[in-house]
């Protein structure tokens, strides 16, 4: 990926192929009626679509090969992110990719060996909690509660 003289992103051939398949996938999986339904759903994303993204290898694009990823680097996720934004495809892709980058760049060997394969194969995903207008809260409390095989996270920020 390069930036041309007119400040436009120019994708590599590999990124162009990812962009083409991502646009088609996101367009097909993200009809406006589906987006609206997901807003009201319990988990906010379609697990079948998530599983298809796993099968396409998209969760491991930026994860090193030794941990089950493709090792293509964070730049390989840009075409996918562009397509997901264009078509409003709701998944935990962004937060999971960011969590994987955190482990890859700053994790201990034990953390990398444990978490990166799970994130690459879709067994685990990450959340981004951006609810409400005040993203600059000074403090917060959070409680996670397990019940009937589900984890409920609740909290308060101020």
Label the predicted regions.
Residues 1-14:
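Intrinsic disorder at enzyme termini
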Residues 1-2, 27, 41:
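Catalytic cores of phosphodiester-bond-cleaving enzymes
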Residues 4, 54-116, 120-121:
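Internal helix-loop-helix
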Residues 15, 26, 57, 64, ...:
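Buried hydrophobic positions in well-ordered alpha/beta secondary-structure cores of metabolic enzymes
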Residues 16, 43-47, 96-97:
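An alpha-helix initiation/capping motif
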Residues 33-55:
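Short secondary-structure junction/hinge motifs that connect adjacent elements
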Residues 69-70, 110-158:
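Glycine-rich, Trp-frequent "lid" loop and neighboring beta-strands that shape
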